[in-house]
C-alpha cells in the first residue's frame, strides 16, 4: 500500500514512538487520514506519552478530542494540516449536481436537515442526518455514517416521498482536523437503504473517490446528489 514511500507501522497507544519517528524523519507537518474510532482502553497498551494524552481525551466529543490531539502535536513542533492542502482535487466543489435535479419537496427536506445539523453542531454531534420531509429519521452518532444509513432503512415510510441524506461539517468544526468524507461506499449503503437523494456541503467534503467515479456510481444507482450552493438554483416542481 505504501510502496515507494518511507513508512513505519506502530501499534495504537505508542505515541512516544510515533513522535520519535516523526522527529527522526524531520517531519514538521502531519495530516490525519482515516475514520476517527475510539479503541477500548483495555485492548491497547499505552506508553507514557499516550497515558498523558489519554488523560485529556477521556469522554470528550470527536471534534474536541481532535483539537486536543492537534494541540499535543503542536507542543512537539508538529503542525496538523488539512488533507485538502495535499489533495485539493479530492475536495467536493462548491457547485455540483448530478443529472436529476431535486424536486421542491426534496429541496425543502434538505434545508430542514441542514437546520437540524446546524443546531446539533454546537453540541459536537453528528455530521450526517437523514430526514423524510420534516421528520428526522436518524442522526449520525458514534457508529459512523454508513452504519447510520443501514439502521435507517426500516424507518423510511415507503409510501411517502422526500427522504434525503445530508452530510456537512459541524458548525465550528475544524475541517483541517476532520473533514467529512463521502464516496462510493456510502453510495452503496444509500442504495441498499432506498435513499435516492443526497445533499452535501461543497468545499467542506473530502471525496473518497474521484468525482467522475462518484458521479457514474450515483447515476447507475439512480441517486441524485447536489451541493447546498447548487440547491439554491432551480429545482424541479
Where do the language-model regions lie?
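Short, charged beta->alpha transition segments
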Residues: 18-22, 37-38, 66-71, 115-119, ...
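Short glycine-enriched loops at secondary-structure junctions
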Residues: 35-38, 86
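Conserved mixed alpha/beta catalytic, RNA-binding, or beta-rich assembly cores of soluble enzyme
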Residues: 12, 62-63, 83-187
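Feature captures the catalytic cores and cofactor-binding loops of soluble hydro-lyases/lyases
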Residues: 1-27, 44-57, 147-237
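Glycine-rich nucleotide phosphate-binding loop and flanking beta-alpha elements
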Residues: 37-39, 137, 172, 205-206
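Hydrophobic alpha-helical segments and helix pairs
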Residues: 46-101
Amino acid at each position: 500500500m505504501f510502496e515507494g514511500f518511507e513508512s513505519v507501522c506502530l501499534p495504537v497507544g505508542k505515541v512516544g514512538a510515533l513522535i520519535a519517528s516523526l522527529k527522526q524523519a524531520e517531519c514538521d507537518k502531519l495530516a490525519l487520514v482515516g475514520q476517527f474510532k475510539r479503541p477500548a482502553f483495555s485492548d491497547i497498551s499505552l506508553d507514557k506519552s499516550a497515558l498523558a494524552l489519554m488523560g485529556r481525551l477521556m469522554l470528550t466529543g470527536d471534534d474536541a478530542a481532535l483539537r486536543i490531539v492537534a494541540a499535543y502535536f503542536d507542543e512537539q513542533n508538529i503542525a496538523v494540516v488539512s488533507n485538502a492542502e495535499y489533495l485539493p482535487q479530492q475536495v467536493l466543489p462548491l457547485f455540483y449536481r448530478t443529472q436529476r435535479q431535486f424536486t421542491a419537496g426534496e429541496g425543502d427536506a434538505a434545508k430542514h436537515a441542514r437546520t437540524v445539523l446546524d443546531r446539533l453542531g454546537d453540541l459536537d454531534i453528528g455530521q450526517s442526518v437523514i430526514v423524510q420531509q420534516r421528520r428526522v429519521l436518524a442522526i449520525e452518532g458514534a457508529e459512523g455514517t454508513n452504519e447510520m444509513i443501514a439502521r435507517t432503512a426500516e424507518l423510511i415510510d415507503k409510501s411517502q416521498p422526500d427522504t434525503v441524506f445530508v452530510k456537512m461539517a459541524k458548525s465550528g468544526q475544524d475541517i483541517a482536523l476532520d473533514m467529512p468524507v463521502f464516496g462510493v461506499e456510502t453510495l452503496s449503503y444509500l442504495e441498499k437503504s432506498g435513499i435516492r437523494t443526497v445533499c452535501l456541503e461543497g468545499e467542506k467534503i473530502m471525496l473518497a473517490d474521484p468525482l467522475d467515479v462518484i458521479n457514474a456510481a450515483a447515476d447507475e444507482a439512480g441517486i441524485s446528489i447536489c451541493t447546498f450552493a447548487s440547491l439554491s438554483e432551480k429545482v424541479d416542481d
